[in-house]
Amino acid sequence: MGCAGGVNGLATAARLAAAEPGSRWLFVTIETCSISIRLDSDDPAAIVATALFGDGAAAAVVSTEGEGIAAIAGSGERMWPDTLGIMGWRVEDPGLAVVFDRAIPPFIETELANAVDDMLAVMGRSREEIDRLCCHPGGVKVIDAIEAAMELPVGTLDLERDVLRDCGNMSAPTVLFVLERLLERGLPQRVLMTAFGPGFTCAGMLLERP
């Protein structure tokens, strides 16, 4: 699932917990993105990956018991057809090759708002009811595109930029690093977690504070 795995994995843990009331599920996500470093390649995507990616791990416990930090109120995913060439990996003899298309930021800027609105509608919510996004910071231009698509003032996604600066893009765990910093600041009443991944996909999950 790539970068979308943090949101999708946590949503899966929530469904497993709901299927077994009283159970506790430990969700763990680990990514070693440094395997994308290719000293044998001068491909621009490989150079970007070397500069952008980092290794990381994150975990969260999901249960139907206790208040916790927030309730998972819903989740969803949008997959766009004929977009496999936008983002992903190729397996080559010397190692993994990253697929990054320049179309990613403009695609997000064009498509994200409708995808978010559709996911929220299924959850019985609207964009106006969301206090903050908690986004996977795929790159500086991706963060800029999210702010533009969602009509947010420039600089709104400050924690996303901080995590990207401090840790790099760690793929799936990265959005949980952003959530951690949001918790330290004080979690708003309703937060929509989002992440993009190969497919091209957008995963979303709604958190609501008790």
Label every PLM stretch briefly:
Residues 1-18, 109, 113, 127, ...:
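Claisen-condensing/thiolase-fold acyl-transfer catalytic domains that form or cleave C-C bonds
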Residues 3, 32-33, 54-55, 199:
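Conserved A3 ("GATE") glycine/threonine-rich loop of ANL adenylate-forming enzymes
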Residues 6, 10-11, 31, 59-61:
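Alpha-helical metal-binding/catalytic segments enriched in His/Glu/Asp
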Residues 24-31, 62, 193-197:
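Short beta-strand segments
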Residues 27-48, 74-93, 139-148, 169-177:
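Active-site-adjacent elements of ketosynthase-type condensing enzymes
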Residues 39-110, 114-117, 196, 208-210:
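Condensing-enzyme catalytic core mediating Claisen C-C bond formation in acyl metabolism
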